[in-house]
Amino acid sequence: MHPLEKFEYCPLCGSHHFETNGATSKKCENCGFEYFMNPSASNVAIIKNVKGEILVERRKQEPAKGMLDLPGGFAQIGETSEEGVCREVMEETGLKVVSAQYLFSLPNVYRYSGIDIHTLDMFYLCEVEDDSALAAGDDAAECMWIKPEDIHTEQFGLRSVRWGLIKFLVRQDRFKSAEEAQK
C-alpha cells in the first residue's frame, strides 16, 4: 500500500475530497491544498576502531528487533544531516563523533506502525573521540566491534544498511563484489 492511501482527509481544511494527484501527491478539491509525499531523511554511521573493526548494534525495537544494525536514525526538524548522525551515535552508543564524512545515500522502506515510511538513508564514515566509552543506549540493545571479514550482511535487519555495508566494504576492497559480500 502506498503511504498516501492512508491520508483520507485534507490536513488543512479537513475535507474528505483529498484526492490522489499523481504518484507522489494528493490535492484537496475543496481548498486546493496539495500535499507531496517525500522520503524522510535518515542517517547511518559507519565507525571503525584502530583495529579496523566496524561498530555494529543489535536492534532493541521493531522493525527488525534483535537483528544487527549500524548506529543511526531519523533526522530531526531543524538539524543538519551531520548533526543528526552525531546525535544518533551519541544516543545509541555513548560515543562522541568528531568527524563525519559523507559517503553515499540509499533509498529504503521502513515499516513502522503499519505504514511504509520511505526514507533516504545518508551514510557517513564517522570518527569518534574515544571508543572506550561505548555503551548501548536508546534503540540499541547491545554494541559490538566486528572485523569486516566477519560481517555477514544477512544478519542486518534493514535492507539499506545491508546494501550500504556491501557498498562500503566493496569500496574498501574487503569484498571483491556485492555477490561475495552476501555469502
Q: What are the residue ranges of the model-derived segments?
A:
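Short linker/helix segments within small regulatory modules
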Residues: 19-25
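Active-site-adjacent beta-strand/loop module that shapes the phosphate/pyrophosphate-binding cleft
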Residues: 104-132
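Short cysteine-rich clusters marking metal-coordination/redox-active sites
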Residues: 10-13, 28-31
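Short metal-coordination and nucleic-acid-contact micro-motifs, chiefly zinc-binding Cys/His arrays
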Residues: 3-7, 24, 41
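Short functional micro-motifs and their immediate structural scaffolds
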Residues: 18-19, 36
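Conserved Nudix-box catalytic region and its N-terminal flanking loop in Nudix hydrolases
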Residues: 49-91
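Nudix hydrolase/Nudix homology domain
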Residues: 1-6, 133-183
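Conserved N-terminal beta-strand and adjoining loop/helix that marks the start
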Residues: 30-54, 74
